[in-house]
Amino acid sequence: GCVICIDLKSFYASVECADRGLDPFTTNLVVADPDRSANTICLAITPAMKAAGVRNRCRVRDIPPGIEYLTAVPRMKRYMQVSGEIVGSYLELVSPQDLQVYSIDECFIDAAPYLRLYRTDARTFAKHLMRRAFEVSSVTATAGIGPNMFQAKVALDICAKHASDGIGQLDDESFQRGIWFHRPITDIWGIAPGIAPRLAK
């Protein structure tokens, strides 16, 4: 099998930047309701803010005082619209039965039949899907590729971060070599802090 898991990077913040003609990789922008207190949780921050050391889903008061940033009011209807447009662009290439929407900014695609159909390989196909997402939304995507949903998701969460092209790829061998001993194990999809100590034994 071949599954591709696609994630839209800092989705809410990236949509807000795209709608303003700004680059989320160079723009400090926070999605949070400014009418609430400094205890308000930031729903999203741009990659530029992450690079400056700001943690995702922090409170507004936790942003270091030296960092200047724009604040965007959350617009869930707009994010759902953009998400729908992106999924629509994928559905021009794959059948609905082979696409599973996991969340507003993430989906799984059973790519195996399409690699034969389009005479391509998984990495090239993932790049094509990522490019389509960017063309319709100006939002950058990352991807994980694996023989099943679990390994594709782990490839996305752990390997794609360090890949220059934003694509992580795992097979059974590289999973055992690279993920088996990965710590903290809570980085791995489905392993919550409560179960981690038992699994670590």
Regions found by a protein language model. Name each.
Residues 111-113, 145-147, 193-195:
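Short, structured patches in soluble enzyme cores that scaffold and shape functional sites
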